[in-house]
């Protein structure tokens, strides 16, 4: 009978540590200024890549998508309020969502950032279906700012703490515990 290999936890890599550090810094800053850190932390996690190029790509996807979805959501919600001042016909949001997704995809293609469609669609759906009428503009603007803060934190951390600068520390940790890795994790 063949013996199954033992399960072994993967090591903790630089990207893992820098992502955790970035999200924690965002949360600490937001707690200090009395704001909810959720979307800044999400931006920080999305914005961390294995290097600056990857951070730009990952963070750009999130930020560009959030900005497109945020402005589009504000415009469509404004149109919804013009067409339906009483707010009783929620079903009107369905064709507005369909229109919004089409426009979002076209805009993402125009900006040559097609991977911004998914995060942009999330923001669009939240604004249309889950944001109170009286706060949809402030919600969308806050979401864009918070996402930008998180992405910028991760890009700064990746810029200030590149792999080349951290490798000597990583070697020391690897020698003492054997668990920290320099891989993509």
Language model: regions and residue ranges:
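Alpha-helical transmembrane segments and their membrane-interface boundaries
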Residues: 1-185
């Amino acid at each position: 009978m063949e013996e199954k290999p033992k399960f072994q936890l993967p090591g903790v890599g630089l990207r893992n540590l820098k992502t955790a550090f970035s999200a924690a810094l965002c949360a600490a800053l937001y707690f200090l200024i009395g704001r909810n850190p959720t979307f800044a932390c999400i931006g920080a996690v999305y914005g961390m890549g294995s290097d600056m190029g990857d951070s730009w790509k990952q963070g750009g996807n999130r930020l560009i998508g959030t900005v497109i979805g945020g402005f589009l959501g504000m415009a469509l919600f404004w149109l919804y309020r013009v067409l339906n001042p009483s707010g009783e016909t929620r079903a009107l949001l369905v064709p507005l969502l369909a229109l919004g997704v089409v426009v979002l995809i076209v805009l993402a293609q125009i900006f040559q950032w097609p991977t911004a469609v998914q995060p942009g669609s999330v923001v669009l759906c939240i604004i249309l279906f889950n944001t109170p009428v009286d706060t949809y503009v402030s919600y969308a603007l806050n979401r864009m700012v918070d996402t930008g803060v998180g992405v910028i934190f991760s890009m700064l951390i990746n810029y200030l703490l590149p792999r080349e600068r951290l490798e000597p520390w990583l070697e020391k940790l690897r020698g003492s515990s054997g668990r920290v890795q320099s891989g993509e994790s």
